[in-house]
């Protein structure tokens, strides 16, 4: 074969990829791989307890509930916010995390795929592949092809069923929810993008709110990461709104009506349609979840903590948050996650708000409706109220960040290093293009009938490739390690009024963050848009992953899917917001900071992927997310006088309906 022959590790990885592909292919039917199907039917999880690090404690717990018939049946919806369903998924997750080798892992996965609820199983499988060393290098098949009904309008799913029944290969156009009468529909391409939905759900798998360190390890900067990823989603959504002549999103308020209703036009695979919410609904108490006044009280306690500058811990001590690590503790109590310093007192503002919003169509449970779109991370960004909820959270975080002392010139300067100029090679131009994905997993079928190809296509934003050209001078006599931080924010609001530096920097979109060694003298840094560490490329389709893994197994070649290993990051196609046909002005800012003092670990520049968490999952950059724009700026002259900081106005063009190069 014309390829690089794989070693034993490569061969095992190709086998793992093959196994994972078939563990999720046709999720709601029988396993289509003979070996895995046999494991699913004959493997006894309790047959050899030496297969597990915990000597079988986790598997005994799960099997006891399974044998007692206590587990959720198959063909039923699953929501992570449902306490019992989450616990069942986590029981399986603990079994997989305790497997000593791939044989044990895949045998249990095949067994529970055959015997457990599909949603619980899929969640446990993906979270375990992300967090277990056994899953390293495995590419997670795109969720929009594994569970297409969570990402695709039900009208299209019905068409897919018809095509399957008549055995007709078909391709259907998908449309975004709502009609042109609804102004929110103009930005549906962002909230309803299949890659954006996947980014959101995978981030919450990488940093689950239920995680405790007994699960195996500490998740570095989890609370701060919760703030930052949702802050970026919020400011990017606002940039898309401005691109479409809409005002930035208003924050949600517990005592005001939720202006925008939402009709999801999506249905559960089993369990009926996702509930709708009419316009102008006032918040109602939700039976068994929370009262509206509890939510206001929780918010007041969090704001009090910010005003006091400390969090009351469970043991009565005070945790000081008036420093760059305060955001970490604050994120944990706002979400709230298993790391919260005092869940009893500070409640669970974010998670409960998701359920409250999801249930406003049926707050008393009178109609016994299934969970709303906000009760699933896969579907929540489809509802415009998701961004209103996160604007509300974001403003609480901002209150904290604005209470911190602004950075001084001494703190921001990089001795001997200056930026001479910043430029862009190529044009900043976006366009829409059709994106296809398979609906094969959406339809039921039997092994005897051959599958026909059923695809859907939908418009997705993308941009022409471009590069940043940054000219720097190093006047030190030695080579230095520099961290390059690139941001941009919309220059004006929807009324054409220019944002002040302090307003703009809070609205800044992070475009890239990377290390580079700079020798003495002048140096040009060229960075391509495709290299951005804040984004990831679209993952290959499930069929492509199947073909690639099977080809690697039969040829003995290495698989080479490294580019898709980490799913953490925005879809690369969304690196730039849409912009406007006549050009929309953005303020582009570049800061070059001292990589040696920024690095949380030594020799880290060898691993340039910031977002991918570096060695052993420790976050490589010890500066706060958003640095140096994360604190308020009372006097922008400090930044204007910094040699290692540069800004310029750039124009971002949207090329409606024309394919770009």
Swiss-Prot record:
Keyword presence, Acetylation: no
Top-rank lineage group of the source organism: Eukaryota
Keyword Ribonucleoprotein annotated: no
A Pfam family reported for this protein in Swiss-Prot or TrEMBL: Hemocyanin_N
Molecular function in Gene Ontology: metal ion binding; oxidoreductase activity; oxygen carrier activity
Glycosylation site residues: 476
Tissue spec. comment: Hemolymph.
Subcellular compartments: Secreted, Extracellular space
Binding site for Cu cation A: 200, 204, 230
UniProt keyword annotations, A-Z: Copper, Disulfide bond, Glycoprotein, Metal-binding, Oxygen transport, Secreted, Transport
Physiological role: Hemocyanins are copper-containing oxygen carriers occurring freely dissolved in the hemolymph of many mollusks and arthropods.
UniProt family annotation: Belongs to the tyrosinase family. Hemocyanin subfamily.
PANTHER family, per the entry: FAT-BODY PROTEIN 1-RELATED, LARVAL STORAGE PROTEIN/PHENOLOXIDASE
This protein's name: Hemocyanin subunit
UniProt source species: Scylla olivacea
Lineage, uppermost ranks: Eukaryota, Metazoa, Ecdysozoa, Arthropoda, Crustacea
